[in-house]
Structure formats: structure tokens, C-alpha cells
Amino acid sequence: MKKTGLLAVALMGLGCGVSDPTSSSHYTDIVRTGYFDSEMNVSDWRNEFVSREEARIDLKVLDSLMTYHYAYNEADNLDESSVLQAISEQLPERMRVGDFAMQLQKALALSIDGHAPRIAGVNEAGERERIEDNPPGQHYFPFELRSTGSRIVAFDGVRRELIEPEYPYVAKIDGIEISEWIEAAQSIIVDGTSQLRWHRGARQLANIGFLRMEMYRASSDQALVLFENHDRSSQVERMVELVEASVAARERYPFAEDARDRIPEDIAYFRIRRMESDPDYIASFAAWIQDSRRVRGVIVDIRDNGGGSRLPLLTLLPHLLDVDSEPVVVNAGRLKLSPGCPGPGCEAPEEGYLANRFMLPIRAIPEGTPERMALDEWLPGFTPQWSPPAEGFSDWHYLIVGPDTDPAFVGKPIIVLMNNGNFSASDIFLSALKGRNGVTLLGTASSGGSARQNEHILPRSDLAVRLASMASFQASNSRLYDGVGINPDIHMEPEPGFFVNASDLMLERAIELIRESRGGSHIGR
């Protein structure tokens, strides 16, 4: 939320040697530099330089982008002009692009936009590489560290073995509680839900070199790790030799073949690792639905699914609605428009601005149709958590889904496996299914995000920044997706053996719930 004058004015003042000596005092960690002073690969984009003048130009561009293209400019506590001015005041004559990227990442991490900031440069392969995925640091753990939702498991992702089978959880590193290390990682993680911050913070644990920087601790090629058992009654301490490159594979567990081996024949299982839009994939999903008509129950596994397309939802949801039921409103949103839109040369399309999200304005939904009648009935109860300003945004758009003419899963128990790795289109998927007859969400709360991200390139540093362009709301409760997320009906975390394919207690519980169900309704509620 902008609370001060335009950054351009502030920068003009700086050019005359006038500045407020206290204006950057609250942003000490954000304006910090020196992350990339050690010897680096000369071809690494983070090793390049940007001058003070070039950086200030990019800061002015970013300030304008935040004002005119960021959907949550008035919804969060980010005072972009103030923080960008603080960065500008502290700029050296020239700096590493990596340091500048870290400053921008930390600044925009004050927002609620789960898709932001994702500051990225171009790597040797010509691909965009996010600084959040490759922050500074020269020391890494030689094994994977993954979150169950509240605890951290250490394992070898190649051999699929726990590092300490009797003590699978990491309790402390260098004598410091694991939660404090995850808190240190929050400097580059957006101010979203607690589960999003924990999930993304846990992903940074492997880069212990970076976290030591954030905690102002000395660098070392070793780390003292305290492992503990399940009930925390016994612990063992190990000195771990660190490595110079990350071994984290960022796999999305479980692998489909691992899970299918555990599924009985009378239960249908489908693993959605990503919300795909590929026609062949969607066709195979639709075929699976048809082939599963005679099963006793259904398990849809979206654990670690970080989003993608809404097509899997549009393929499945019609088969969960009774053929005689009304369509359901799933999502409501308004798009942040470019200056001057709508207007001459920038007229509003008849189908609206969000057709690629399968969302339509009310004018594009004919009166008398089932979709329009469902919308008219739903609208009086819609009280958005935050109302976007009238100026600068499109009309409201809505995602409405109706039943299939021959729904396959009505009357069957449907268990959806979820976790805090679910985000974006997966949040839409979960919110649309939550509360439907026969559907039970099992796992941990999703991260929370839906904002139709747009990528913008800063002209002098060539850094990319992604910003939310849509204020997106859950139809079921009028709340935003960003900063909220979706809660499960039954909370359950995975056990350590899940990460090495030794067991899957969540999947076993889903099978039990189906076995216990007589009609699929009200499981776990």
C-alpha cells in the first residue's frame, strides 16, 4: 500500500543531495549488499554489475509497475515507495546484479502476493532463474530436507533412504532450533499464509550457507545437526560435512507408480502432479473418470502440486455435481487494467478480460441460462474480504461450473490428498471441491494464491519481476486466495517413510475412509 510520495520525486531529491537520513532505518536487512562478493562463475548473471544510475532507473520503473499493474497495491501492507526509496538511498556506485535482485526480492516479499516477487535473471542456458530458487550461499547439506507441515525430515533423495532412520526429524542446526532457521529464510519469502511461509522457508534449509548469512553467523564447511525421534524422547547429534552445490531435486512426492502399488482394485486413484493443460493429458484424465464409474471410491492426489491450469478442475468437478443441480460459482475476480483502459483503443472485450481463466463478466452470461440463474442467486451473499477500487479495475468476472449430463462420481466417496505445497490453480481446485457432497480434503492446508501473474522486465538490470494482475476471491467464503489458502477437512501430515517410499499413511487413511463410507457424505466432518 503506497503511503508516501512518488519515488520519482524522491529520486530527484537524491540527485540534488537531499535525503532523509532516517528513511532507510527500517529496511536495514533489505538494503544489505555483499552477498556475492566471493569468487563466482564469471558467466553467472548474479555476478554482473549494475550502476547506481541504472539501478535507480529500474527502481522508478518498478515503482510505476507497482502503482499501475499490481492488483494488491491497496490490499497489503507493502509501502513500495518507501522501501524502494530506502534502497535507492543506499545504492553504491555500482553493485552486483545478484545483490540488486536480493534487495528487490526482499522488498516485494513484504506483499501478500504469493506469485511475487520471483525476481529472476537469465542463466547460462538462456532461461530465467529466480533468486529465491538460487540465493547466495556456498555450503549445502548433502541430503534433502523436506517439510511434513510442522517438522523437517532428512533423507537421501537418490537412494531413497532416511539419513537417521531411528531419528528422522531435524530438531536443531548449530544448536539453533529449526524454526529459527526457517524464520531466517522469511527475508526472501512473500508475506503469505503461515503454511506458505513454512513450506518455502523449509525449502531454503538445504542452503545453510545462505541462512547463516541471514543470521550473521560465520561461514563453515560443517554443520552440527541434532536429529530426533517421532515423540522427541530421544536425540542424536551428528557433525555433517557440507557440499558446494545443492542436491535438492525438488521432486513432487509421491511418484504415481509408488502410490498405485498401494491401491486396491475397487478404488480409483489419480495422481495430479501439476495442473496440466495439455490436451492429451486432459483426455487421459477424462478417460480415467469414465473408466472409474464402477469403483467403490475415488482418491485424487494433488500433494506438492504447485498449480498450472484450471482444466483438471473443469474436467473433474462436473462429475461431482448431481445432474439436476444448479451450476456452482467457484471464483470471482477483477483484473487490474492498464492506464486508460477501458477506453479508445482499449475497449473491453465482450467476453471480458479473463476468458483464459474461464471467467466471464455478467454481461457475457445470458439471462435465463442455468449459469446466470446460479450467479444471480449467489451474488447477494458475496461480501468480498477486500473491495478493489472502482477505478483501475475491470468489472467482476466469475468462474461457473455446471454438472455433467452423466456425472460419474455422484454418490461415491471422493478423497483429495493435499498439502502445503498446493498453490495457485491447486488452490482453485481445492476451494471448488471443498464442501461438495462426498468430497473430503485430507492433509495440510494449502499455501494460498491466485492472482494471474504477469512478468515485467526491468530495462537496465534485465531482471524479471512477477506481479499479481487479478484480485481473486473464493466464491465459497468471499475471502482472497492469497494470504488465506484452503484448510483440509481432516488434518494429517506425512510420516518420514513417505519421502523414501517406505510407507504412505495418508494414502492408507484415504483408503480406510472409503472403506468406512456408505455413501460418501460427511466423511471426517
Residues covered by each model-derived region:
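Sec-dependent signal peptide recognition
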Residues: 2-8
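C-terminal motif of bacterial Sec signal peptides marking the signal peptidase cleavage site
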Residues: 14-15
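Flexible, low-complexity junctional segments that flank or bridge functional domains
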Residues: 19-353, 428, 445, 450-464, ...
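Loop/turn elements at helix/coil->beta-strand transitions in domains of secreted/extracellular proteins
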Residues: 265-267, 294-298, 410-414, 437-440
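A substrate-binding/cap region within the structured catalytic cores of diverse enzymes
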Residues: 322-394, 402-405
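Extended, charge-rich low-complexity interaction segments
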Residues: 358-377, 471-491
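Short, conserved helix/loop micro-motifs enriched in His/Cys and acidic residues
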Residues: 403-417
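Extended C-terminal subregions enriched in glycine
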Residues: 413-435, 440-448
